[in-house]
Amino acid sequence: MNILVVGNGGREHAISWKIAQSIFSKKIYVAPGNAGTEIDYKLKNIDISSNDINKLVKFAKEKKIDLTIVGPEEPLSNGISDVFSYYKLPIFGPKKFSAKLESSKIFAKNFLNKYNIPTARHKEFSDQKLAIKYLNRVKFPIVIKVDGLAFGKGVKIIKNIKESEKFILDVLVKKKFGMSGSKILIEDMLHGEEISFTAIINNNGFLPMAISQDHKKSGDKDTGLNTGGMGAYSPVSFVTSSIYNNIIKDILLPTLYGMKKENLIYTGILYIGIMIDYNNNVNVIEFNCRFGDPEAQSILFRMKSDFLLHILSAMYGNLDSQIIELDNRYSLGIVLATKSYPKKYPIGLNILGNFENELKDTKIFHSSTKNINKNLTTNGGRVLCITSLGKSIEDAQKKSKIVANSINWQGKFFRNDIGNREIFYLKKYKNYKF
């Protein structure tokens, strides 16, 4: 099969790398890709933006692409699946209206409430004065979210009224997030542990993948600003079989039922951010209509079965008959980023390190890299994701840190505590059988 992967991040590097292992894949194109996909002889970068839908359609026709897999959320929210389907070009990813589950947090909240899916209480606002008036009656801390896509940076935990007034001014008046911030959600703050539940779904079934835990704050011990994700690991041992069953029963099944009732046409990845409270209750934080990044790197690095076969089964066959085979070891990814990320950061910095000598069971996934005059350079805030397998979480963490410390550029930083929550829970419940 001729495959086109749309996107240029670490998630898309992991997807194309995994697809290349399938017996069903022949040629794999990545649009636009990055330096990591460029140096992989099984992959070919195409200089087309992931948001240039017309050029992607033209390319898919010319190269007789058998399947297009969409990585990032923006082209999905812009209707890439609708356009490809119109031209009878097979594509893996939900239609534009269905992708509103991610592109509009208000749409998602209304959906959750309508189908009695547990989530935090909330109010929506487009007027600054009404929002601040409401905040004078609430108990802090609370959470404020911009309605539209903000690439992981449109959520803020607010500790007091002064802080909330500033954030609302930035969003609703100063338009810091553009049209994405034309409305906001003010939510009760949920407490507990946040996990990422990922599944391949269609309108007739689902295939759960590995559960993972992301680390969204830029600094150790969850300090600093919200980012797109600074690291992830899988599996997550504190998700017991009882909690897992509650996720399926209380969240996934009613979500799929609601999708059918609302005619949300969907064949793709569904990633649900879930908060598990200290009584083991589950609540939906958010829907994402694609893999998380860096969750994709940790999940796909564990996967032993044929990812492309699972996708094809979702599109053409019986998805419920599929079984995902996973390595029983831990997979842990550490994101290497450029100083000042997620604020303004420089690009074009030379990256130094021996990429040829990856440790056994370690993979360097490229997120924002570019080859300039045969020099590997940074091309964004999150640059690389060092992902390792280990018999223990400590083993996987150690391997990733060794490689992370061997790669350098001006201002490189990473979190040192990715996976520490798992270590904490395993020690706390060392006599408990998960």
UniProtKB/Swiss-Prot annotation:
Cofactor annotation: Mg(2+); Mn(2+)
Look up the EC number in the record and give it.
6.3.4.13
Q: Where, by residue number, does ATP bind?
A: 135-196
SUPFAM superfamilies from the xrefs?
Glutathione synthetase ATP-binding domain-like, PreATP-grasp domain, Rudiment single hybrid motif
Catalyses: 5-phospho-beta-D-ribosylamine + glycine + ATP = N(1)-(5-phospho-beta-D-ribosyl)glycinamide + ADP + phosphate + H(+)
The record ties this protein, via InterPro entries, to: ATP-grasp (IPR011761), ATP_grasp_subdomain_1 (IPR013815), PreATP-grasp_dom_sf (IPR016185), PRibGlycinamid_synth_ATP-grasp (IPR020561), PRibGlycinamide_synth (IPR000115), PRibGlycinamide_synth_C-dom (IPR020560), PRibGlycinamide_synth_C_sf (IPR037123), PRibGlycinamide_synth_CS (IPR020559)
Cofactor binding mode and count: Binds 1 Mg(2+) or Mn(2+) ion per subunit.
Q: Which domain of life is it from?
A: Bacteria
What pathway does the UniProt record associate with this protein? Answer: Purine metabolism; IMP biosynthesis via de novo pathway; N(1)-(5-phospho-D-ribosyl)glycinamide from 5-phospho-alpha-D-ribose 1-diphosphate: step 2/2
Pfam families in the cross-refs: GARS_A (PF01071), GARS_C (PF02843), GARS_N (PF02844)
Q: Which residues bind Mg(2+)?
A: 286, 288
Span of domain ATP-grasp: 109-316
What GO terms describe the biological role, i.e. biological process, of this protein? 'de novo' IMP biosynthetic process; purine nucleobase biosynthetic process
- Gene Ontology molecular function terms on file: ATP binding; metal ion binding; phosphoribosylamine-glycine ligase activity
Q: Which PROSITE patterns match?
A: ATP_GRASP, GARS
- Keywords of this entry: ATP-binding, Ligase, Magnesium, Manganese, Metal-binding, Nucleotide-binding, Purine biosynthesis
Q: Which family does the UniProt entry place this protein in?
A: Belongs to the GARS family.
Q: Which PANTHER family match?
A: PHOSPHORIBOSYLAMINE--GLYCINE LIGASE, PHOSPHORIBOSYLAMINE--GLYCINE LIGASE, CHLOROPLASTIC
The protein here is known as: Phosphoribosylamine--glycine ligase
